[in-house]
Amino acid sequence: MLKSVQGLWKDFFGIRDDGRKREYGSLDEVRKRSALRSRRKQMRPTGKSVLKRPRKVTDRKTEEKIRTNRRKTPKRRLTKIFQTIRDVFSNDNENMSKMQNVCGDMTRILKKRSQGRPSYMDTDTAKSRILRSDAFKRKISELKYNKQRISELRSGSSDGSSGKDRNQSLYLDREILLQRQIKKRDEKIKALESKLQSLQEALNYSNEKYRILEDLLDSSNIHPSYTKSRRTMSNLARENDEIKPLKIDLSPSPIRRTNSLFTSSPMKTYNRDGNIPEMQPLQENISPACPTPPYRSRETEKEDETLSPISVDFSSYLS
């Protein structure tokens, strides 16, 4: 209590040391420090080699004045005084009782039953719901039927009663199979009905289109014979899919053989197709001034082996 009174006294007269205060020195020292800091920032290189300009340094004296004025406002001083007086006359027992009440409430809240689960999800209600469900009854009937079938297969007795039971089970199997077949047929009928409906709609659309085209043809001044001819042509094309040209086996074009006497090419032999007929050379005079040379066969060319354009008969010189 004595310490709190001393703190109140020091706060009232402004003698108490404030840890937030910091000695910055004189005004000249502060200015020197800010100038050095700005120079260092200018000399520091950057990634893009662009010098950063120093920020505008505010006057430290004005900042200190603002802080001292804020600190010495009467409102803050009054709040401090009231806080110290409250600390002097505060009662710890009251705080402890509040904490105890809060803890007691928490324990009571934790001990309460969780409200998330409804009452119908208890075990008894769940069992009753399962027993009353249709799925459970269906499963039990299937199990009974399976057990009955297994017992019939194992026994294999030829008594009248067993025969009746067997016939009854066969009837049941047939009934199940028939029901499945009926279901499949119904599905097929539905699919065919939907398809028939779509085809009916397409047919109605085509009929309407045909009627509109007929109206357009009637309104236009076209001769009926022309329209009939066009219709017959289109019908023929539809019947034959498309009009294709006739495929006729044409004979291959003959290859004219080159003669070395009349060409500068040294070609002597060539691969000729035997199926292609060889053309006979022209034996007629083009003009009297330029008579055609005598025809020489391939054998004589092979014997002479000459490329000269002038033919010489050496047999006259041998005699």
From Swiss-Prot:
Phosphoserine modified-residue sites: S251, S260
GO molecular function ontology, one term from the record: lipid binding
Region (Disordered): 34-74, 278-319
Bias (Basic and acidic residues) ranges: 56-67
The keyword Phosphoprotein is assigned to this record: yes
Biological processes, Gene Ontology terms: spindle pole body duplication; spindle pole body localization
Pfam families cross-referenced by the UniProt entry: NBP1
UniProt keywords, alphabetically: Phosphoprotein
Bias (Basic residues) ranges: 34-43
Any single Gene Ontology cellular-component annotation: nuclear inner membrane
Subunit relationships: Interacts with NDC1 and MPS2.
Other comment: Present with 339 molecules/cell in log phase SD medium.
Name recorded for this polypeptide: NAP1-binding protein
Species this protein is from: Saccharomyces cerevisiae (strain ATCC 204508 / S288c) (Baker's yeast)
Gene from which the chain derives: NBP1
